[in-house]
Amino acid sequence: MKVIIDEQVHQAILEFYAISMRLHPTLDEETVLAKVERLIGAMYDLGKHPFIYADARLKKSWMAAEYKETIVEDFHIAYRVETDEDGEQYVAIYDAVHSKLYY
């Protein structure tokens, strides 16, 4: 199944790691890049098994929008399976928040 990641999700991930690198000098760019690649890869893998995850519980707005939620690399990912005009289903990822920023 095709996966579409909202631009704000990319921004949230990049901003989190940019700030993390400034706050933690021991966190190097190579490590961050590897984490981002694993995170993005896992989001695209949602297209293989989008229905196995539970309904979102982290944010009220996610619950109201009936998103599903998964956690990858300490990021909570909010997504929903949508249907396009041709009747094809796809995964739309709408939001992401790191556990350290939410709790």
Predicted regions and their residues:
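Enriched for short, Lys/Arg-rich terminal
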Residues: Y67-Y103
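Basic, Lys/Arg-enriched alpha-helical interface segments
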Residues: M1-Y67
